[in-house]
Amino acid sequence: ATREELSDRLAHYGSHFWLMFDGGTLIAFVDGMVTDRADLTDDLYADAALHDAHGAWQMIFGVNTLPDYRRHGCAGQLIERAIADARAQGRRGLVLTCKDRLVHYYAKFGFVSEGVSVSTHGGVVWYQMRLTF
């Protein structure tokens, strides 16, 4: 996402960003809007105003970690927190898309692959993953 897109997302659903710091440095974050839509479609990435605070599904748009902090469990801790928060908020579950090579990673958290996503975001083949409570 661009700086402008992230700024727009923060303005619309800042409470759906999970952040990890090392001292004063942001080292990892997970973010995504809430919606009643069951599938993660490209228009959701493009328009932060589609966020519905009372929606059934927590979407995960980004799982980001600085290179020096990768493979230390940072992203996993944030994903677990996002899952716990979605459960506590009474959501039906979470939905994300990922590349084929990461399907097994998200499966460790209980996400199930639903196959190739309708999303063509960034010109990439994405797999939709869902964790249902």
Model regions and ranges:
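Conserved G/P- and acidic residue-centered "switch" motifs that form tight phosphate/ATP-binding loops
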Residues: 73
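Conserved active-site alpha-helix within GNAT-family acetyltransferase domains
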Residues: 88, 100-124
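Active-site rim helix/loop that mediates acceptor-substrate recognition in acyltransferases
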Residues: 1-23, 29-40, 44-50
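Conserved GNAT acetyl-CoA-binding A-motif
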Residues: 79, 85-99
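Short hydrophobic/aromatic beta-strand or adjacent loop that forms the aromatic wall/cage
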Residues: 15, 124-129
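Conserved acyl-donor/pantetheine-binding loop and adjacent beta-alpha core of acyl/acetyltransferases
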Residues: 29-64, 70, 80, 119-126
